[in-house]
Every structure is written in structure tokens, then in C-alpha cells.
Regions:
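A residue-identity detector for tryptophan
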Residues: 41, 70, 101-103, 161
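Long non-globular sequence segments
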Residues: 26-27, 31, 116, 199-200
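Intrinsically disordered, low-complexity boundary segments flanking structured domains
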Residues: 68-73, 96-100, 154-156, 174-178
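Active-site-adjacent substructure of cysteine-protease-like catalytic cores
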Residues: 85-141
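Short secondary-structure junctions and interdomain/linker hinges
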Residues: 74, 78, 107-110, 196
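Noncatalytic regulatory segments and standalone regulatory/sensor domains
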Residues: 105, 117, 128-200
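Cysteine-nucleophile protease catalytic domains, especially the papain-like/related folds used
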Residues: 1-89
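Intrinsic-disorder-associated interaction segments
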Residues: 60, 93, 178-181
Length: 200
């Protein structure tokens, strides 16, 4: 049985929530190993704010890169059929024929660093859709007020997506909602099953 994808629990935990949602998206509840869930929460929210409070700047790029490496090694050695890859800079692009695009077409998913209200944010990309759109699950699930075209709300697919966004918008270099921003700050964590089972 597949789990519904979940919203973040605070203003700061979009990173680990998206990693957890990647596992929920790819695997049946009965397949998920508790050690995977524990490790996601242990490694997330590793930053400190100016006042020295843990987690108040969310999850660092270093932690997300580490989690991609950890997923890959855990998949190789612990009987959990998962693989992951961390893409950054120019490699972190959502374009037809690109690496991230292919992983989504083959049933994988990608945790993407983007912007929301000009603040860094993570979302989970889950599907390539018609009309040049990508399906994604935004864990900050408030009813948005989209002021420009290219983004829309999806209802009734709690195990897969709650937004559809044109891929050209994802690749923008500004800080508009769901844009990845400048090349230097881009991150994609690609995650997929390695046993060939369908994720839908």
C-alpha cells in the first residue's frame, strides 16, 4: 500500500520532508525500512541561524549531497533497492532528454531546491506531464496565489503531486516561485528504485 505524501511540520523542514516523500512515493509502506526514515530525520535541519538555534536555516547542501551518497550506498549494501545521485550547477537542469528528465520518465523522482516567496525551498518532482509541465509535490501545501502563468494546483493525487509547473519556469535563474535560480545554487537529488518495480 502506498502512503500519501505529507506536508512539512514546521517552516524549516522542507528538505527532510521531501526526502521522506521520495521514499513514500517510490515504495510501498510494507517495503520501507525504519532505518531509512530515522536517517533522513537525523541528517535534516543541520543548519544554525544567527542566534545559534539549530535547524532555523533548514537543511544544507552538504546534508542533501550526503543523503544522495547515503541512499546509493545503503541501496548497494542493505537490501533496499534504491539509488540516488546529487546534481548541482549546470548539471541540475530539468530539460527534455536530460538526466533528471530521464529519471522521472523511468519512474524515479527528484528533490529540487527552488524558491518560494524568494526563500530557498525544497519540493519533490514526481512526473513528466503533457503541455511541457512537470508534476511536483510541494510540502508547504497552502493554497497559492500564483500571479503569473506556468503554475497550477493539482487536486486529488495525494500520493503523487499537488502542483504542475512548466519546466521552462523551473529552469529560470530568478527567485520566482519554483524557479531553481542562479546556476551556482542549483541542486537536484535524483532518487529511484533499482529493482524495476513500477512506482505508480
Amino acid at each position: 500500500m502506498k502512503n500519501d505524501l505529507i506536508s512539512q511540520s514546521s517552516e524549516y523542514d522542507c528538505g527532510p520532508t521531501c526526502l521522506l516523500n521520495a521514499v513514500r512515493f517510490l515504495f510501498e509502506r510494507e517495503e520501507i525500512q525504519p532505518g531509512v526514515l530515522k536517517h533522513i530525520w537525523v541528517m535534516g535541519n543541520d543548519t544554525y541561524c544567527e542566534k545559534g538555534r539549530l535547524g532555523f536555516h533548514g537543511t544544507s547542501r552538504a546534508a542533501m549531497r550526503y543523503m544522495a551518497d547515503w541512499f546509493r550506498e545503503y541501496g548497494k549494501h542493505c537490501g533496499f533497492p534504491v539509488d540516488a545521485e546529487f546534481l548541482s550547477g549546470e548539471d541540475a537542469a530539468m530539460v527534455p532528454g536530460g538526466k533528471a528528465w530521464k529519471w522521472l520518465e523511468e519512474g524515479g523522482c527528484a528533490v529540487m531546491r527552488c524558491f518560494a516567496d524568494k526563500i530557498p525551498h525544497y519540493v519533490l518532482l514526481t512526473a513528466i506531464l503533457p503541455e511541457d509541465e512537470v508534476g511536483l509535490f510541494d510540502p508547504y501545501d497552502e493554497e497559492p496565489d500564483f500571479r503569473e502563468p506556468g503554475r497550477r494546483v493539482i487536486h486529488g493525487q495525494p500520493k503523487k503531486m499537488n502542483r504542475a509547473v512548466r519546466y521552462a519556469l523551473l529552469n529560470r535563474e530568478d527567485e520566482s516561485d519554483y524557479a531553481m535560480g542562479e546556476t551556482a545554487v542549483r541542486e537536484l537529488i535524483l532518487i529511484r528504485r533499482t529493482d524495476g518495480k513500477d512506482t505508480v
